[in-house]
């Protein structure tokens, strides 16, 4: 065989190998489902549960935040005063309840009995005086006005006696169950007010609810804040979720737990790894923010993909290409 022919065959073989390799690579790249999504934006608006003057803020925008970290404080003074007042209220209610349970002392009962005897004597005198006045009035010795004054004194003495007798009876039988129950309810109410005062004072300290990065610092020390008004906005950096959408035709490929490859423009040759964590049970129209070659009017299902090897380069809102090919199972 002539030398030029051999060279030609060799070149043809090389071209065939290159073409075959290119076709194989492209077929591997195009194999499987490809979706487009974004890293979920997850933020928390942090606020005080109570209102007041902002005394301090210990963090600034961009700071890394740890769960349980003290972020700021309100002026404690009004809430410390309310707490002392609530403690005093509990002491008063407790003393009243204890008094109701203990009943009356022997000395108090003796004093009440003496008051009854005194009232009885006063009534007897008033009754006798009234009787004498009646006789004098019949004989026209006194006027009708004198008789009426005697009757009024007798009635007043009778009322005083009745009051003293009722008091002695109460002292001897003890407090009524209804009075004891009312005193107990007052004590429980005072304790509840104390617990609320303690909670309010505790809530003058702002605690980070989770790890993350501080996005915004909305107010500055010295500001008067209403309860619930936003003080800080925290970006939740872990776990990292990717939101993507799949149409009904490919829904069967998106079982929860399936391994996924995630590509970003910043590192196209080094994918992140993830797993499908959630598939929405209801369809929706494709959101405008999603990059997709299909019609945006298609009904799709939302996916949540949990990134298992996320780093700080994977930022919230970043566009992501989601690959479902077999490479995800082996990497």
UniProtKB/Swiss-Prot annotation:
What are the record keywords, sorted? Coiled coil, Periplasm, Signal
Cellular localisation: Periplasm
Pfam families (UniProt xref):
HlyD_D23
**Quick one: signal sequence residues?**
1-19
Record keywords: Nucleotide-binding included? no
A GO cellular component entry from the record: periplasmic space
Q: Using the record for this protein, list the coiled-coil segments as residue ranges, or answer none.
A: 107-208
Q: Which SUPFAM superfamilies match?
A: HlyD-like secretion proteins (SSF111369)
The family line of this record is: Belongs to the UPF0194 family.
Write the protein's name: UPF0194 membrane protein YbhG
Organism the protein comes from: Salmonella paratyphi B (strain ATCC BAA-1250 / SPB7)
Q: What is the lineage of its organism?
A: Bacteria, Pseudomonadati, Pseudomonadota, Gammaproteobacteria, Enterobacterales
């Amino acid at each position: 065989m002539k030398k030029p022919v051999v060279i030609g065959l060799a070149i043809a073989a090389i071209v065939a190998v290159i073409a075959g390799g290119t076709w194989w690579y492209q077929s591997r790249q195009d194999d499987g489902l490809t979706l487009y999504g974004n890293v979920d934006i997850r933020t928390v608006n942090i606020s005080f549960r109570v209102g007041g003057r902002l005394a301090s803020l210990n963090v600034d925008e961009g700071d890394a935040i740890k769960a349980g970290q003290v972020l700021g404080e309100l002026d404690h003074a009004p809430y410390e005063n309310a707490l002392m007042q609530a403690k005093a209220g509990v002491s008063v209610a407790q003393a009243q309840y204890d008094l109701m349970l203990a009943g009356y002392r022997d000395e108090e009962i003796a004093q009440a009995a003496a008051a009854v005897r005194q009232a009885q004597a006063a009534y007897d005198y008033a009754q006798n005086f009234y009787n004498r006045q009646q006789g004098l009035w019949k004989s026209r010795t006194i006027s009708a006005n004198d008789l009426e004054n005697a009757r009024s004194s007798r009635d007043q003495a009778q009322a005083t006696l009745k009051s003293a007798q009722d008091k002695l009876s109460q002292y001897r039988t003890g407090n009524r169950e209804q009075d004891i129950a009312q005193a107990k309810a007052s004590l429980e109410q005072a304790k509840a007010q104390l617990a609320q005062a303690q909670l309010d004072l505790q809530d003058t300290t702002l605690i980070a609810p989770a790890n993350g990065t501080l996005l915004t610092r909305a107010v500055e020390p010295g500001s008067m804040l209403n309860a619930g008004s936003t003080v800080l906005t925290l970006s939740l950096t872990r776990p990292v979720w990717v939101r993507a959408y799949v149409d009904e035709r490919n829904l069967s490929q998106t079982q929860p737990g399936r391994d996924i490859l995630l590509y970003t423009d910043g590192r196209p040759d080094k994918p992140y790894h993830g797993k499908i964590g959630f598939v929405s049970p209801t369809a929706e129209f494709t959101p405008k923010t999603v990059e997709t070659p299909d019609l945006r009017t298609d009904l799709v299902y939302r996916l949540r993909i949990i990134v298992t090897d996320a780093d700080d380069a994977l930022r919230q809102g970043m566009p992501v290409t989601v690959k479902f090919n077999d490479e995800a199972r082996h990497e």
